[in-house]
């Protein structure tokens, strides 16, 4: 499920491995790696899909949120924790308030429909998985 022939917006776990951390984050890449390497050993790993970093970047670019972020951060004193907290809250709200572009929404809806097609009562979990979350000098909890 890609965007006009460029990078995919959604990737299935069985398409992923540890070489894909930069595309889908550590948790998603690990789930893909487990499906690939442990399913044949009888370990049950639930199927699923990940939205890609490219999908997120496209969302920010096409909606104009990225420009608003740059403008806000240019005016923010990065040494002032209070200003940073306010800027972070504003950025989160912009992201929450901005609808997905139809292409991304359709990719996620299609993947969800495919995943739930076999079980009308299926349960789902939504997890964050930042592309740099497992680096020793970075924390991206909640991204």
Locate each region found by the language model.
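N-terminal beta-alpha lobe that positions the nucleotide/phosphoryl donor
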Residues: 1-143
């Amino acid at each position: 499920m890609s965007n006009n022939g460029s990078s995919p917006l959604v990737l299935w776990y069985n398409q992923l491995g540890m070489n894909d951390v930069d595309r889908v984050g550590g948790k998603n890449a690990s789930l893909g790696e487990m499906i690939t390497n442990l399913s044949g050993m009888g370990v049950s790993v639930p199927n699923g899909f990940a939205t890609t970093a490219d999908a997120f970047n496209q969302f920010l670019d096409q909606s104009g949120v990225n420009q608003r972020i740059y403008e806000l951060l240019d005016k923010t004193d990065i040494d002032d924790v209070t200003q940073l907290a306010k800027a972070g809250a504003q950025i989160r709200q912009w992201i929450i308030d901005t609808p997905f572009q139809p292409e991304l929404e359709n990719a996620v809806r299609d993947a969800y429909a495919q995943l739930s097609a076999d079980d009308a009562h299926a349960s789902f979990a939504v997890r964050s998985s930042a592309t740099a979350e497992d680096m020793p000098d970075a924390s991206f909890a909640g991204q």
